[in-house]
Amino acid sequence: MALRTLDSLGSLAGKRVVVRCDLNVPLKDGKITDDGRVRASIPTLHALIAQGAKVAIVSHLGRPEGAPDAQYSLAPVAQRLSELLGKPVTFASDTVGAGAAEAVSGLEDGDVALLENLRFNPGETSKDEGEREAFAAELAAFGDAFVSDGFGVVHRKQASVYELAKALPSAAGALIATELDVLDRLTENPERPYTVLLGGSKVSDKLGVIGHLLPRVDSLLIGGGMLFTFLAALGHRVGSSLLEADQIGTVKGYLEQAKQLGVEIVLPRDVVVASRFGVDAEHLVRPVDRIEDTGWGTSGLGLDIGPETAEVFSERIRAARTVFWNGPMGVFELAPFAAGTKAVAQALTEVDGLGVVGGGDSAAAVHALGFSDDQFGHISTGGGASLEFLEGKRLPGLEVLGW
């Protein structure tokens, strides 16, 4: 079956439509610091408003413990949605209680309401199917149809993603359709050379995608904290850098597999080593075989790829026709260790082909470092969902929509 899209729902004029968006944005002092996910939800919302639907948006934010927690309120998001849509957005003080019921019942054709954080309710993320179904039924009472547009959560079997889609006539929104189109281009006959750049802190988070991609790519570039496990697998000493010793054997297996497949795994030549973790820490650039040659010995820790590596990676990225990047090259939140991430991001903007930022921390990094969405071929809104798709996994939030 093909993914059901908005057209499959017929006319939605005057209909109540519950829309699952992913509005899980970072907040600081009650202010949104990166509104990328809010902006990504706008095309679907505009389409529903134009049809004259009565739109009730649901989303999570953060990881509250199944109960109301003011620091995770969606109230700031309602304000930003209103600004982007150019119309008032009613904010409900709860998700399925009297506040939500009043907000939805008061909607006129083309109006929009945002209900409070889904995860203030234990049924949203419950491991018990019956509890999820009961919560989904409460949400379904607010709609005549359901539109799933939160790509960042389609790999989760949660009430508003899976059970709600079964409880109402349902379809995917424009964002999910766009995300899948891009991911299909990465998996179905990608233009070559095809280069994948992986970073982030842990090898263990990327094992599945490394194993699945090795037979499919031309080269794999490794940065971020995970690089030190690769270096250790080659016999290098890495000081106090992040190291998953229990994954060294697995990494050795991947290095051997890549050799047999003729796929090049490109590892850093140099790294930025710091005396400690901190923005004002002393730091030096060292070749990967001299990480402990700093005066700090085994207490030094690598926090970014070095300038030579950044140039090598950038050249590889610019030479490719298809590039997928997931995971920062270093601790980009600290200015002395952001150069590697900034360099590869810049190179990705210069790709003559498809350059994809794979969501999560990578998307946060490009925004924090001053890049705009339109500089890249695509910035995914789902880090975990993108990786699981590229691992070849079936995603419950998509299967329930006919995918």
From Swiss-Prot:
The keyword Amino-acid biosynthesis does not apply. Belongs to the phosphoglycerate kinase family. It is found in: Cytoplasm. HAMAP family: Phosphoglyc_kinase (MF_00145). Its EC number is 2.7.2.3. It catalyses: (2R)-3-phosphoglycerate + ATP = (2R)-3-phospho-glyceroyl phosphate + ADP. It comes from Leifsonia xyli subsp. xyli (strain CTCB07). InterPro entries: Phosphoglycerate_kinase, Phosphoglycerate_kinase_CS, Phosphoglycerate_kinase_N, Phosphoglycerate_kinase_sf. Pathway: Carbohydrate degradation; glycolysis; pyruvate from D-glyceraldehyde 3-phosphate: step 2/5. This is Phosphoglycerate kinase. The keyword Kinase applies. SUPFAM superfamilies: Phosphoglycerate kinase.
